[in-house]
Structures are given as structure tokens and as C-alpha cells.
């Protein structure tokens, strides 16, 4: 597995004084822009807030309670939206796939730059839609926090430090990758 994928994790212990430049955000957005897209429809859109600007404040206000405790320390918050075509199931479904691919590529790009990405579904999508005049044919799905980790975690909220110190775990491949039929683990040929 590539080391950037191994290094990626959704931290919360951001340095509230660290900034992310417009140039760095542009590189991260470019990674999202160049993500694979079904039928070249390119349905993903971004609303970008840098800490201290009005967009950032509106995005932070839309966060659910659990995310409001740590995400405002991020250097940037990005609302990621995609197509919401109620009359076109393919467009609706593939728009979500395209969004996931874009966020994944943005996350890996961020890690390569020493920036920690944390995608969140815990926000009020209706409030975000209203705050930013998101059109009816788009749906806000994710807010991506981007930040630099604090050098001294003892200065952070103990709940954040505790959560960030938990091991990063995933189910074993034998429980998620199958061959032949559902539940039969995939095994590499020897």
C-alpha cells in the first residue's frame, strides 16, 4: 500500500494558529478536480472557507455539535457538493461516487503536503444549502476539514487528544473482499 494512504487518518487535534495558504488549497482542489468522473459529467463542486473568513464561519456554524468542538481549529473547511437529480437515478448515484473519489484524491494530496484531511458528514446540509445558495440540483454531502496537527497535544481538549490517540483500525480483508460468492474470502493466488 502506498505510504500516503497509510499516513492518512482523520485527526481532530489541529493547531489553531497554523494556516493553509490559498496556493495549498488550490493544489488540493486541483486533485479533486482531476478525480475520475462517470461519463465526464464532473458534478462535484466546492465552497472553500479559510479560517477567519465569512465562508469558514458559515461552514463552522453548520457543523453538528460533535464537530464544532474541534473543526474550527482547522485552517480550511470545504463544503463538497454533487448532483442531486431526483429524476435521474444514475446521475444521483454516480454523483455520490464522483464526490467520494474527489474527496479521496484531495485527502491524499493534502497528506502529501503535510496537511491532515478530515471529511465530515456531521453537519446541517439544509443550513449549508441556505447559507451558500446551493442550487436545488446539487446536494451538500461532505465538509472537508484541512489542518496541521498541533505540535503539543497536551494543549488540546483532552477529549480530542483521547480520540486522536486511539488506534486506526479497519476490518481485515477476509471480511470485506470476497471471491466466488459473498462471504468467501478472496485469497491471492500463490
Set out the residue ranges of the language-model regions.
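Acidic, surface-exposed loops and disordered segments
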Residues: 1-190
